[in-house]
Curated annotation (Swiss-Prot):
Pathway assigned in UniProt: Amino-acid degradation; L-arginine degradation via AST pathway; L-glutamate and succinate from L-arginine: step 2/5
Record keyword Ribosomal protein present: no
Family statement: Belongs to the succinylarginine dihydrolase family.
Organism in which the protein naturally occurs: Shewanella oneidensis (strain ATCC 700550 / JCM 31522 / CIP 106686 / LMG 19005 / NCIMB 14063 / MR-1)
Pfam families (UniProt xref): AstB
UniProt-listed Enzyme Commission number(s): 3.5.3.23
Gene3D superfamilies noted in UniProt: Succinylarginine dihydrolase (3.75.10.20)
Self-association state and partner proteins as the record states: Homodimer.
Function, in words: Catalyzes the hydrolysis of N(2)-succinylarginine into N(2)-succinylornithine, ammonia and CO(2).
Protein name (record): N-succinylarginine dihydrolase
Active site: E174, H250, C368 (nucleophile)
Length: 444
């Protein structure tokens, strides 16, 4: 049976804006209050996804969340009509309104952690939505995320959906952005790397001083248990707290893996050599550990360009390619390194550049925009086929974006009652296009 790694990219929602909500994410903070272009953002995301589909990759799309989130605003005491709720929030608590309008679900690397059936004791594909408790604007996502994942991977014979972890900082979980999987072939049992920022229950363990560590060891271990992984299938690695304090808020900003390749910065981890040795012990295959030295690419350049927030994909030919943002081309040190990388003896043979600037300005590169799901042929056939990106779906989604999305959105526009109507109309139509059923609060 054939095995694949599919990518499920997040559709950018109609309220994509720059409110600077993500403390610890340098790009998000630096671009706060810029005027955004939701239409361009959605089309850039679709274009990147379609390019991967055209390369022969299995590519799916995940629907965005309902925003503005009036349910949350009502839950915290705003009342009256939809327009009155928005007006009150804008006047007395604009930061809360901004949080309830974020289109951050576009970064599906934070949607969930996924373990393929080759790794799990029950032979099913397991999904656990991330609780994202560290950030208010993301902590309101998990319930709808779970519904969207269940409507996308909708055959219980193949797919097992867990609830998100308890909503407490001890179980802070940011999903696949802190998880990668190494293997020989996608269908073989692999080693799942869980990267965490701190041990919540150990006050003496190292942790960052300036920015929060969003992922805890306790959360990573809970997911490994839920997903029925054996100890031999797991390696738990602490991210270097010093790089978290330099803006590396998720591991996918400083490392990325695919099959037998781990591409990472010299400063990415604590106890790096011991952990690489553990991976070698647990995964008996030829491995390529590509360590990028600080002397060639500084942490600052890595964060600014999102060198590691790239996708490494295995093309149908068997060669690997890096999917990089154009920001990597524009950074001399990073561009020079990527050109050098192609001359090294590794499976990575090409770099393809994509413009995802609307996402990048909010602190999310190509890897943030996708959730990886390793699947066999039967599992691919069991997915809701209306979520897989074909030429027809690409055209339909582009037309849908053109019809419903604004090309200009400022934070002041978030209080416009018309935005609620536009957003709900768009999402209602999207659930019909993608055959998702009633996943949104306004539909229930």
């Amino acid at each position: 049976m054939k095995h694949f790694e599919a990518n499920f990219d997040g559709l950018v929602g109609p309220t994509h804006n720059y409110a600077g909500l993500s403390f610890g994410n340098v790009a998000s903070l630096n671009n706060a209050a810029l005027v955004s272009n939701p239409k361009a953002a959605a089309k850039q995301g679709l274009q990147k996804a379609k390019a991967l589909a055209d390369l022969g990759m299995i590519q799916g799309m995940l629907a965005p969340q309902e925003r503005p989130d009036l349910n949350t605003l009502r839950r915290i005491g705003f009342s009256g009509s939809d327009a009155q709720v928005l007006q009150q929030a804008a006047k007395t608590a604009p930061a809360l309104l901004n949080a309830c309008c974020s289109a951050s679900s576009m970064w599906t690397a934070n949607a969930a952690t996924v373990s393929p059936s080759a790794d799990t004791r029950d032979g099913k594909l397991h999904f656990t939505p991330a609780n994202l408790v560290d950030k208010l604007h993301r902590s309101i996502e998990p319930i709808t995320t779970g519904r969207i994942l269940t409507a996308t991977f909708n055959d219980p014979h193949y797919f097992y959906h867990h609830n998100h972890l308890p909503e407490h900082n001890s179980f802070g979980d940011e999903g696949a952005a802190n998880h990668t999987r190494l293997c020989q072939e996608y269908g073989h049992a692999g080693v799942e790397l869980f990267v965490y920022g701190q041990e919540a229950t150990n006050p003496h363990a190292p942790k960052p001083l300036k920015f929060p560590a969003r992922q805890t060891l306790e959360a990573s271990m809970a997911i490994a248990r839920l997903h029925q992984l054996e100890e031999d299938n797991c390696v738990f690695i602490q991210q270097n707290p010093a790089v978290i304090d330099q803006g590396v808020f998720h591991n996918d900003v400083i490392a990325v893996g695919n099959q037998n390749v781990l591409f990472y910065h010299e400063q990415a981890f604590l106890n790096t050599q011991a952990k690489l040795d553990e991976i070698k012990r647990k995964l008996d295959t030829e491995l390529y550990f590509i360590e990028v030295p600080t002397a060639k690419v500084s942490i600052n350049d890595a964060v600014k360009s999102y060198l590691f927030n790239t996708q490494i994909i295995t093309l149908p030919s068997g060669e690997m390619a890096i999917i990089a943002p154009t920001d990597c081309q524009e950074n001399p040190a990073v561009y020079a390194y990527l050109n050098e990388l192609l001359s090294l003896n590794t499976p990575i043979k090409q770099v393809l550049y994509f413009d995802v600037k609307q996402s990048m300005q909010n602190g999310g590169g190509p890897a943030c925009l996708r959730l990886r799901v390793a699947m066999n042929e039967r599992e691919v056939a069991a997915v809701n086929q209306h979520t897989l990106l074909t030429d027809a779906l690409f055209t339909r989604l582009n037309t849908w974006v053109e019809k419903h999305y604004r090309d200009r959105l400022s934070t002041e526009d978030l209080a416009d009652p018309q935005l609620v109507i536009e957003s709900r109309t768009a999402l209602d139509e999207l659930t019909q296009i993608m055959k998702l059923g009633s996943v949104y609060p306004f539909q229930r």
